[in-house]
């Protein structure tokens, strides 16, 4: 709604494959979600295809929403960034499919973490409940309660062109230097 009010395009959203369950998977997909596996290891075809999809998103200048931590924090605490999708975005930028990539960090916080009870059970050793239709039905009671406020904060945008000023060109970096760059960009996004 906020995007609509400000004449901004709704982004496509990178979502975990665990959210592709009936019936919400279809709803999420129609709302712009695309689903990705948690790991690309030992699957070069999937990795290559996914990277091509990310390059297409960049080339078409479609806003892309992703969670730098790889998932929502159910504890409410900041988690370490995951750099897989970030690295694909930067590789697409470096290949020239787009002039610049601009990251807009968004903080979403809550007075109450709804998953607190299940998170505590997991910390005590219980297995994590798998997302699915049954968990959605059981969660219906959650919608009846008031949990306080939701806070949304947009941080200063981070332009990759600006970020790279004074740094060696991406194309001249070796694998270790690129990994350090991914770390630096990830830290700049979350700080």
Q: Model-found features: residue ranges?
A:
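Membrane-interfacial terminal anchoring regions of lipid-handling membrane enzymes
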Residues: 1-191
């Amino acid at each position: 709604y906020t995007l609509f009010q400000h004449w901004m395009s709704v982004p496509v959203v990178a979502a975990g494959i665990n959210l592709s369950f009936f019936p919400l998977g279809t709803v999420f997909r129609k709302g712009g979600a695309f689903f990705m596996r948690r790991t690309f290891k030992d699957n070069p075809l999937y990795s290559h295809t996914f990277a091509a999809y990310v390059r297409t998103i960049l080339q078409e200048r479609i806003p892309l929403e992703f969670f730098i931590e790889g998932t929502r924090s159910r504890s409410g605490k900041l988690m370490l960034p995951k750099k897989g999708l970030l690295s694909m975005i930067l590789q697409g930028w470096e290949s020239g499919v787009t002039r610049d990539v601009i990251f807009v960090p968004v903080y979403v916080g809550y007075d109450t973490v709804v998953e607190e009870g299940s998170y505590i059970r997991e910390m005590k050793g219980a297995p994590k409940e798998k997302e699915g239709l049954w968990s959605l039905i059981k969660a219906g009671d959650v919608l009846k309660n008031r949990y306080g406020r939701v806070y949304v904060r947009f941080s200063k945008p981070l332009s990759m062109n600006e970020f790279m000023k004074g740094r060696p060109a991406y194309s001249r970096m070796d694998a270790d230097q690129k990994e350090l760059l991914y770390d630096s960009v990830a830290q700049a996004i979350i700080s």
